[in-house]
């Protein structure tokens, strides 16, 4: 009697806790990849990581001149407002862009070295997290030099908002990095999306402006997860500057921002699960497609 072989093309199933254990076991690989990312970025650069601090400083000067002298924003203590939104936004954009191209950029490793491929987008985000802390130093130095209060009740929102931001950018990064292996236009689409995303996020204008002029659409405006995260950063940093600063934000109390972060955090975890599944399913074909 002849035997019949039946082949199945069933995709590998993601077992989250088992995979987390594997990632934790190989965490040194993640650290090495992140260090490599930073070394490559600042290779042959005279200023090195100082560029990560100069970038937000340059943005501050440009936006300050534009929105103070040419298009007055009317925002009290505008430099603090700008930096408190620009620093987390920069982490989001650079983290997502780096994650999107990470697997293609690691094409010399994927076919030759056995390691969890999730390490590539995670390392890209971790490298940008290092830059984020350097930029945070610029913000703290600015606050101290010009005598702005640094510690107040709202500061507790900053680490919470950072945690939610990291989950959200990781969720998006898993999806875009996996898609970019097969569809190389993904990176360009991400860049275009980020341009529109910037102007739909309250960084150079106050969210209260949207709240006052488009009251009916404000709830739709808050469907933007990054807007909620940036608002929490602004409440945690800018909201302690003065009473006038607090009045330019959508709500004075911390509870409103905490609830927004909770909603975005839960949604980001759900998105992370499904984008991770997508990445895991496609990772088996990376070596062939690269």
Locate predicted features.
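Hydrophobic transmembrane alpha-helices and immediately adjacent juxtamembrane helices
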Residues: 1-290
């Amino acid at each position: 009697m002849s035997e019949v072989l039946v082949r199945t093309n069933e995709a590998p199933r993601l077992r989250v806790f088992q995979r987390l254990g594997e990632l934790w076991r190989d965490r040194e690989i993640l650290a090495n990849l992140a260090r490599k990312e930073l070394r490559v970025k600042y290779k042959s650069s005279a200023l090195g990581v100082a560029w990560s601090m100069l970038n937000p400083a340059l943005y501050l000067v440009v936006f300050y001149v534009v929105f103070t002298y040419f298009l007055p924003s009317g925002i009290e203590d505008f430099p603090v407002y700008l930096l408190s939104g620009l620093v987390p936004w920069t982490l989001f954009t650079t983290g997502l862009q780096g994650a999107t191209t990470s697997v293609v950029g690691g094409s010399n490793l994927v076919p030759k070295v056995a390691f969890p491929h999730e390490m590539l987008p995670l390392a890209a985000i971790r490298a940008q997290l290092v830059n984020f802390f350097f930029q945070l130093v610029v913000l703290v130095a600015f606050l101290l030099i010009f005598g702005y209060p640094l510690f107040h009740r709202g500061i507790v929102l900053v680490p919470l908002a950072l945690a939610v931001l990291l989950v959200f950018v990781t969720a998006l990064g898993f999806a875009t990095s996996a898609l970019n292996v097969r569809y190389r236009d993904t990176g360009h689409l991400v860049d275009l999306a980020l341009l529109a995303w910037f102007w739909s996020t309250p960084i150079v204008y106050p969210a209260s402006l949207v709240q006052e002029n488009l009251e009916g659409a404000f709830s739709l405006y808050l469907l933007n997860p990054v807007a909620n995260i940036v608002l929490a950063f602004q409440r945690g940093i800018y909201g302690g500057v003065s009473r006038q600063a607090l009045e330019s934000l959508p709500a004075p109390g911390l509870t409103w921002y905490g609830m927004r972060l909770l909603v975005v955090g839960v949604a980001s975890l759900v998105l992370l699960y499904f984008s991770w599944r997508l990445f895991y399913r496609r990772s088996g074909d990376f070596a062939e497609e690269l």
